[in-house]
Regions:
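Conserved C-terminal portion of the radical SAM core fold
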Residues: 177-178
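N-terminal [4Fe-4S]-dependent radical SAM core
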Residues: 5-94
Length: 178
């Protein structure tokens, strides 16, 4: 029964479905999103569209909790995993590329980093990629389709507004049509 299945995602404490609860139902265990920094840039920061960045984005590309880009992915993963396990002892992981625009780069670099991230630990169950609407291409779509066949894949698409005037005000670098 669809309604019954849907209601199973709610808890007695919360009348909405949290991501934590969704993951527990999907994977059967606590899931940690390990925020990795692939040392990507952003076309709204590197001069392609602008060098100012969006008004809400920090110097670290809003990846303030991601790993240090000067460290290897292995070291970033290990350090963040150890920190998470100080609070929660058991769980599996989603490799999370959060900082900057993680589909903005040569396709070979993207493929290498994403595939490497999936191999960092035997308990990685998925990949989460943060990006923006104007950084997709047919090659990116093909790569995402390949990754989706291999693992649980989510794309975080930064949609800050549906109003062109607001997008311009916040220096988003694209319009609603994008």
């Amino acid at each position: 029964n669809l309604i019954g299945d849907f209601m199973n995602y709610f808890t007695n404490e919360k009348h909405y479905n949290t991501l934590n609860n969704y993951y527990r139902h999907k994977f059967g265990i606590k899931i940690f999103k390990i925020a990795l920094n692939g040392n990507f840039s952003c076309p709204n920061r590197d001069g392609v569209f602008s060098s100012q960045g969006c008004i809400f984005c920090s110097e670290s590309g809003s990846g303030d909790f991601a790993g240090d880009p000067s460290m290897s992915l292995e070291k970033q993963f290990k350090d963040i995993k150890e920190m998470m396990h100080k609070k929660w002892h058991k769980g599996k992981y989603i490799a999370y590329f959060q900082a900057n625009t993680n589909t903005y780069g040569p396709i070979k670099k993207l493929r290498t980093l994403f595939e490497k991230a999936l191999e960092l630990d035997e308990n990685i169950v998925g990949l989460n990629i943060g990006t923006i609407a104007d950084c997709f291409s047919p090659q990116i779509y093909d790569l995402l389709e390949e990754l989706n066949q291999k693992t649980y894949l989510t794309i975080e698409l930064g949609l800050q507004s549906m109003h062109d005037q607001t997008l311009k005000l916040i220096n988003r670098g694209h319009d609603l049509q994008t």
